[in-house]
């Protein structure tokens, strides 16, 4: 039975690893990697909400008295 002959195993394993390594190199070299995106400056306008100016601590839920 030839599979029990272990004298050729290192040669087969080495050739298999070398072949897989070369195939992976060829596969990854054919891929196109996009360059990283450059940051874009955006003009952000502050939102004017009508409740921002009149919201005070009096209306906050944590400052209201406890109700039983």
Swiss-Prot record:
Segments passing through the bilayer: 8-24
Record keywords: Acetylation, ATP synthesis, CF(0), Hydrogen ion transport, Ion transport, Membrane, Mitochondrion, Transmembrane, Transmembrane helix, Transport
Major location category of this protein: mitochondrion
Transport as UniProt keyword: yes
Membrane topology designation: Single-pass membrane protein
A GO molecular-function annotation: proton transmembrane transporter activity
Keyword presence, Magnesium: no
Record localization: Mitochondrion membrane
A Pfam family hit: ATP-synt_8
Biological function: Subunit 8, of the mitochondrial membrane ATP synthase complex (F(1)F(0) ATP synthase or Complex V) that produces ATP from ADP in the presence of a proton gradient across the membrane which is generated by electron transport complexes of the respiratory chain. ATP synthase complex consist of a soluble F(1) head domain - the catalytic core - and a membrane F(1) domain - the membrane proton channel. These two domains are linked by a central stalk rotating inside the F(1) region and a stationary peripheral stalk.
Record's subunit section: Component of the ATP synthase complex composed at least of ATP5F1A/subunit alpha, ATP5F1B/subunit beta, ATP5MC1/subunit c (homooctomer), MT-ATP6/subunit a, MT-ATP8/subunit 8, ATP5ME/subunit e, ATP5MF/subunit f, ATP5MG/subunit g, ATP5MK/subunit k, ATP5MJ/subunit j, ATP5F1C/subunit gamma, ATP5F1D/subunit delta, ATP5F1E/subunit epsilon, ATP5PF/subunit F6, ATP5PB/subunit b, ATP5PD/subunit d, ATP5PO/subunit OSCP.
Entries under PANTHER family matching the protein: ATP SYNTHASE PROTEIN 8
Protein name per the record: ATP synthase F(0) complex subunit 8
